[in-house]
Swiss-Prot record:
The lineage of its organism: Bacteria, Pseudomonadati, Pseudomonadota, Gammaproteobacteria, Enterobacterales. Belongs to the RapZ-like family. RapZ subfamily. It comes from the Bacteria. Modulates the synthesis of GlmS, by affecting the processing and stability of the regulatory small RNA GlmZ. When glucosamine-6-phosphate (GlcN6P) concentrations are high in the cell, RapZ binds GlmZ and targets it to cleavage by RNase E. Consequently, GlmZ is inactivated and unable to activate GlmS synthesis. Under low GlcN6P concentrations, RapZ is sequestered and inactivated by an other regulatory small RNA, GlmY, preventing GlmZ degradation and leading to synthesis of GlmS. Residues 266-284 are annotated as: RNA-binding. This is RNase adapter protein RapZ. The gene is rapZ. One of its GO terms (molecular function) is ATP binding. Keywords: ATP-binding, GTP-binding, Nucleotide-binding, RNA-binding. It comes from Yersinia pestis.
């Protein structure tokens, strides 16, 4: 497991980096005192979770020896890595002017320029032992997040998770949906007394819907639409794409179609999840 320590001058992008690491599955803590690093790592060791912690000038130890000692106290299962973010002086000044935020050292009655310079001196012990230094002067927020994914995961884009969820319109449209498809016009197994108690996961219902050409046409056109735009969605700095399929009650048609779409994209190597809102409510 990795303990990623994120540091750098204020305004260089530590918060952006921490959010990107969280998207990559790291357990993230902002501004944790250095002396608590071993305790955090020990807590997470049994859960097999990598962690990322930001350290700025406000929680820097008084001497480098304190930091070194904390590193020696980490569980053997954790491999510490130090990421240091920086930007040139003019860029940091411009970013502070744009956001109108106070520098952490402004309480010492320093000018912004002096605060930036003093912070550089205070953080030098961390910078000198960094495993990776990234200059964010010419980077946008998205470019920084992309670079971290490339460096840490070895691939350019994060893996998009496709979520296919069924629902019933009479229960309301899911608020987390990126796309909503209405399948209430498809043949309805509800009107067959034998199929009515079943769901779209049961073989008799699957066989019923599988006999209808219009069902296959809808699934084909929907998956073709998603396939056409999926490459752009994957590069749009998002973690999830939620596709909601709705029928009247969320029990038969929407469940079947959601499962068919999920199976199709799963077979093509995509990271896919499926869930059925109405069926989950019935289990509760």
């Amino acid at each position: 497991m990795v303990l990623m320590i994120v540091s750098g001058r204020s305004g260089s992008g530590k918060s952006v980096a921490l959010r990107a690491l969280e998207d990559m599955g790291f357990y993230c803590v902002d501004n944790l005192p250095v002396v608590l690093l071993p305790q955090l790592a020990s807590t997470l060791a049994d859960r097999n979770i990598s962690a990322a912690v930001s350290i700025d000038v406000r929680n820097m130890p008084e001497s480098p020896e304190v930091f070194e000692h904390a590193m020696t106290q980490l569980p053997d299962s954790f491999s510490p890595q130090l990421l240091f973010l920086d930007a040139d002086r003019n860029t940091l000044i411009r970013r502070y002017s744009d956001t109108r935020r106070l520098h952490p050292l402004s309480a010492k009655n320093l000018s912004l320029e002096s605060a930036i310079d003093e912070e550089s001196d205070l953080l030098e012990p961390l910078r000198s032992r960094a495993d990776l230094i990234i200059d964010t002067s010419e980077m946008s927020v998205h470019e920084l997040a992309e670079m971290l994914r490339t460096r840490l995961l070895g691939k350019r884009e994060r893996e998009l998770t496709m979520v296919f969820e069924s629902f019933g319109f009479k229960h309301g449209i899911p608020i987390d949906a990126d796309y909503v498809f209405d399948v209430r016009f498809l043949p309805n197994p509800h009107w067959d007394p034998k199929l009515r108690p079943m769901t779209g996961l049961d073989k008799p219902v699957i066989s019923f819907l599988d006999r209808h050409t219009e069902v296959h046409n809808f699934i084909y056109q929907t998956r073709s639409y998603l396939e056409q735009w999926l490459p752009m969605l994957e590069t749009n700095n998002r973690s999830y794409l939620t596709v909601a399929i709705g029928c009247t009650g969320g029990k038969h048609r929407s469940v079947y179609v959601a499962e068919q779409l999920a199976d199709y994209f799963r077979a093509r190597g995509k990271n896919v999840q499926s869930r059925h809102r109405t069926l989950e409510k019935r289990k509760q």
